[in-house]
């Protein structure tokens, strides 16, 4: 059963103005890369690019209990997959345009551009991603502080 596809279909039904194609194929890429024990929290579709008029790079973005996954199946062969863990996450920017919106996810390595999203979906996406990343990043930082304190105490 493809849980990713079902969640993306729900998103597409809720926000039909979002431009997205080949949802089943794109969902299969992300489904393939889910780790055992990973639970899907939120999923949506967008175009993985910065341009409004580039309509043929639909990707599926999935927020799990461990990370953010971005995947899309290429038309001829191959696919693209990216994983953003909370420790790699820096910031998220939202742009609300006249017809569509855009989200930029800033990581340590790169900026991920997700465009052609229904403007009404932007707040929901931002809330889900930001809330998860902040919560998990706090856990990660607390774990790092504890480990450094333990190491300092061991050195004494």
Model-predicted segments: where are they?
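Small-side-chain structural scaffolding
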Residues: 43-46, 62-64, 101
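The phosphoinositide-binding surface of pleckstrin homology
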Residues: 38-53, 73
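Polybasic phosphoinositide-binding surfaces of eukaryotic membrane-targeting domains
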Residues: 56-70
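Acidic, Ser/Thr- and proline-rich intrinsically disordered linker/docking segments
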Residues: 1-23, 27-32, 53-54, 74-156
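Secretory/extracellular carbohydrate-interaction modules
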Residues: 33, 37
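Flexible glycine-/small-residue-rich
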Residues: 46, 65, 72, 107
